[in-house]
Amino acid sequence: MASLFKDPTKLSAYRDRRFTGTQEEYEAALQASVTVYVGNMSFYTTEEQAYELFSRAGEIRKIIMGLDKNSKTPCGFCFILYYSREDAEDAVKYISGTMLDDRPIRVDFDWGFEEGRQWGRGRSGGQVRDEYRTDYDPGRGGYGKMVQKELEAQRELVDYGGAFQPNAPPQYDRGDRKRGYGDSYRNDRDYQRKRYRNDERSSQRAPDSEFKRDAIDSEKNPRFREKGDSDEEDDDYDKRRRR
C-alpha cells in the first residue's frame, strides 16, 4: 500500500528539463523555493479563482497563468509565488488533490519561475500532455491537438466529396424517391450523354431518311419527272386526263 502514496523524500514528482544544473542543485532549489506549480487545471479557470483557493494557504505575492504560446489563452497550469516557504509547503500539503473549477488539481514544489516558462511547450502551443491525449476532456479543449487535427482532416475530406458521409440528409424528387447528393448530378450527366448520342445518331441517319422521303414523294407524284423526260410526254398525259 505504500506505493499508493508520494515518496516523502521527493519534493517534486517531475524534473524540469529547462533547469541547467545538476540533480543536487535542482533539489536544493526546490527546498529553498517559495513557488509552487499547479497542474491539471481547466482552460477556463481564471486567475481570480486560483487566487481565492491558494490564498487560504498564505499570502500570495504573484500568480503567473500558463498560456498557449500561439493563442495566448490559458492552457491548464499556473505558478503561485508565496512570500514564505512555510506557506508554499502548506499549499502542497493541503491543496494538492482538491477540486478547483470541478477538477482535481496537482500542486508540486517548483524550483522558481523564470520568464518564458509561462508558455506551453507543445508543438501546437499548449502543454505537451495535450498533444496526443485521446480521451475527451471538455475542461481542456476536448480531444488532444493531434486527434483534433485528424478529425478536422476527415471532416474536410467528407465536405469535399472525398469520402462517404453517412449522416448526409436525403433529398427527394417529385416521386418521393430517396437519393443522395450525387444522384441528381449523375442523372443529369447521363441525360446529357444520351441526348448527345441521340443527336449524333440522328445526324448520321439524316441523309438516308431524306433520300427515302424523296423516293416516296416521287412515287406518289405522277408528275415527278426523271432525267430524259420531255414536255411532249406531259402533254400526252394531260390529253388523256381530259378525255
Swiss-Prot record:
What are the binding positions for mRNA in this chain?
Answer: 14, 37, 106-110, 117-121, 127-128
Q: Does the keyword Nucleus apply?
A: yes
Where in this protein does the record put region Disordered?
120-144, 161-243
GO BP of this protein: abscisic acid-activated signaling pathway involved in stomatal movement; alternative mRNA splicing, via spliceosome; defense response to virus; mRNA cis splicing, via spliceosome; mRNA splicing, via spliceosome; primary miRNA processing; RNA splicing, via endonucleolytic cleavage and ligation
Single GO MF annotation: RNA cap binding
Subunit-level organization: Component of the nuclear cap-binding complex (CBC), a heterodimer composed of ABH1/CBP80 and CBP20 that interacts with m7GpppG-capped RNA.
Q: Which family does it belong to?
A: Belongs to the RRM NCBP2 family.
Q: Which PANTHER family match?
A: 20 KD NUCLEAR CAP BINDING PROTEIN (PTHR18847), NUCLEAR CAP-BINDING PROTEIN SUBUNIT 2 (PTHR18847:SF0)
Function (record text): Component of the cap-binding complex (CBC), which binds co-transcriptionally to the 5' cap of pre-mRNAs and is involved in various processes such as pre-mRNA splicing and RNA-mediated gene silencing (RNAi) by microRNAs (miRNAs). The CBC complex is involved in miRNA-mediated RNA interference and is required for primary miRNA processing. In the CBC complex, CBP20 recognizes and binds capped RNAs (m7GpppG-capped RNA) but requires ABH1/CBP80 to stabilize the movement of its N-terminal loop and lock the CBC into a high affinity cap-binding state with the cap structure.
- Protein's name according to its UniProt entry: Nuclear cap-binding protein subunit 2
Q: Which organism is it from?
A: Oryza sativa subsp. japonica (Rice)
